[in-house]
C-alpha cells in the first residue's frame, strides 16, 4: 500500500527503533528480523509518531537537510508499509 503526503505513519506495534552499539548503527527491530538504518532512515522513523503526516515529516527534514525530500520520504515509508513495518494511523 503506497502512502500519500496526507498519510500519518506510525510503526507497527511490534516494531521499535533502537541503536545497535556493536554496529554503531540505528536499527528497526521486529519479531522476524532487523532493518539496518542509515542516519536519514533513522531520522525519518523517529518522526513517525502517529501524529505527523508524511508531508509534515518531510517539511521537518527539508529544513534540517536544506533539500526537497517529500518524494523520497514518501517512497521510503511506502516501502516499509509494504513490508507491514509502518501503517497509516
Show where each model-derived region lies.
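Acidic, low-complexity/disordered tracts enriched in E/D and polar residues
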Residues: 1-46, 74
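Long, charge-rich, low-complexity alpha-helical segments
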Residues: 33-89
Amino acid at each position: 500500500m503506497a502512502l500519500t503526503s496526507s498519510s500519518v505513519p506510525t510503526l507497527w506495534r511490534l516494531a521499535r527503533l533502537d541503536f545497535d552499539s556493536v554496529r554503531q548503527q540505528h536499527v528497526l527491530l521486529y519479531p522476524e528480523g532487523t532493518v539496518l538504518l542509515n542516519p536519514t532512515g533513522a531520522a525519518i522513523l523517529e518522526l513517525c509518531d502517529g501524529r505527523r503526516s508524511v508531508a509534515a515529516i518531510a517539511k521537518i527534514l527539508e529544513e534540517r537537510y536544506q533539500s526537497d525530500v517529500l518524494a523520497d520520504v514518501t517512497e521510503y515509508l511506502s516501502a516499509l508499509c509494504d513490508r507491514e513495518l509502518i501503517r497509516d494511523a
